[in-house]
Amino acid sequence: MSEIYFSVKTPLNIEVRITAQYWQYLITIKHPIMKGREEIIKSVLQMPDEIRQSKIDTNVFLYYKRLDKLYCVVVKHADVEGFIITAYITDKVKEGVLVWTK
């Protein structure tokens, strides 16, 4: 099992983590633009502008925050824990059920 790279608590009281191995996959294969943006991802998770629940998978939540750009961190929830599926810069908030807003 890969070591935890970082872990943060969200406003939904979910402890979200990402492993070092998955982080490398995310920044080399999925979204290289996110390299070096760990603190931004933590901020999006800890203090999002809004959180939406996926219409397709009710265990998947999209955390949004506008900083220099609009960031989205996609998290799979499992009880009180969660793990990052992906993180990216987007131009707009996607559809989904609004479950939390600041």
Please place each PLM-identified region on the residue numbering.
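Ribonuclease/tRNase effector modules and their secretory precursors
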Residues: 1-102
